[in-house]
Amino acid sequence: MSGKERVVFLDRAAFTADDLPIPSFDHNWSEYPETDTADIVPRLFWATIAITHATPVDAEAIGQLHKLTRIVVTGPAMVDVDACGARGIAVRNLTAGEAPEQTLVGLLEMLVDETRR
């Protein structure tokens, strides 16, 4: 993969500013306090990595997101893993009890590293 990753956090309001430091890898970062269903595709259209806490990402949306390669789920969001699998999109969930400030950034950096190998 070449160029910067485009990371979009669909519902950042679930975390305080100190909870989730922005990752160190080369990227463009966009975040929204919350995202309505009608805004999922427009917000993720150019994204390579999506982060969602409670915003569901269904098969219909996934079918329209041709740049998306990874989804990180930090909470109860419903993501259609079958649709993701069919499109080659990796889905990773943070395990309950993990410290989000450590695991989210670490997970994002690991996913980017895996993709660049």
Where are these regions (language model features)?
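N-terminal glycine-/charge-rich "phosphate-binding" loop or analogous flexible N-terminal tail
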Residues: M1-A47
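Phosphate/diphosphate ligand-binding glycine-rich loop within oxidoreductases
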Residues: T48-R117
